[in-house]
Amino acid sequence: MAMRQCAIYGKGGIGKSTTTQNLVAALAEMGKKIMIVGCDPKADSTRLILHAKAQNTIMEMAAEVGSVEDLELEDVLQIGYGNVRCAESGGPEPGVGCAGRGVITAINFLEEEGAYVDDLDFVFYDVLGDVVCGGFAMPIRENKAQEIYIVCSGEMMAMYAANNICKGIVKYAKTGKVRLGGLICNSRNTDREDELIIALAEKIGTQMIHFVPRDNIVQRAEIRRMTVIEYDPNCSQANEYRQLAQKIVANTMKVIPVPCTMDELEELLMEFGIMEEEDTTIIGKTAAEENAA
């Protein structure tokens, strides 16, 4: 099978890295050959696969030796659970330079040094938060990742972020082959969450590829720096990640999304009771003015 390059996006803190690593562990269990490229300065995209606090990043190691040209592939590529190949792009210190540029430099280095071996089935790019700048859009802008999955939940800001990411996909889909593969709902146990994400997916022209229920075993595994698949392979949550993996392997629905307008998104949120209808009579009024009324 041809190598599939997938990028995982979503709001910061939504559980992208945890979901990605559990998905990858499930794919590895199926015998798939995989590489994860962390595209986040936090460098937490591979820690559950490697049982590590944080992998040494390409940008950190380049700074230590002088430049990225002075690095060897074995310096930055580690092998973890299920023979998954792991690399972290990293970025500059907070407040200095552009972390997005680190992503560009790191992926170019991995390509030039032969990290993308011929027998890989999947490459996953775990990307920082929203598409906030051109650097973090690099995996889709440069046609590296052609398949995008957005991790979201039934919370308002997670849905806003998912919609914004769709706008970024549309921009680059016009000039390349990037497509949206679907939404992964990483549940926060909000009311009617699965119905809401299915409705959002339909509105933007895609699918909710899987609903991952909330389960404390995910945190128990994380404390041990392990995926659920490895920590407790027989639990129900491990089977959820296996189902997600199977659905992604079989997925043929790859679309150019149609992002919602802000009004459409707010109407959907009001329909499901996430947002209350706006009362225009209270806008701009102080507490004193409201009490006097």
Swiss-Prot record:
Binds 1 [4Fe-4S] cluster per dimer. It catalyses: N2 + 8 reduced [2Fe-2S]-[ferredoxin] + 16 ATP + 16 H2O = H2 + 8 oxidized [2Fe-2S]-[ferredoxin] + 2 NH4(+) + 16 ADP + 16 phosphate + 6 H(+). [4Fe-4S] cluster binds at residues 98, 133. ATP binds at residues 10-17. It comes from the Bacteria. The modification ADP-ribosylarginine is found at residue 101. The keyword Iron applies. The reversible ADP-ribosylation of Arg-101 inactivates the nitrogenase reductase and regulates nitrogenase activity. Pfam families: Fer4_NifH. Its EC number is 1.18.6.1. Keywords: 4Fe-4S, ADP-ribosylation, ATP-binding, Iron, Iron-sulfur, Metal-binding, Nitrogen fixation, Nucleotide-binding, Oxidoreductase. Its cofactor is [4Fe-4S] cluster. One of its GO terms (biological process) is nitrogen fixation. One of its GO terms (molecular function) is ATP binding. The key enzymatic reactions in nitrogen fixation are catalyzed by the nitrogenase complex, which has 2 components: the iron protein and the molybdenum-iron protein. Belongs to the NifH/BchL/ChlL family. NCBIfam families: nifH. Homodimer. This is Nitrogenase iron protein. It comes from Pectobacterium atrosepticum (strain SCRI 1043 / ATCC BAA-672).
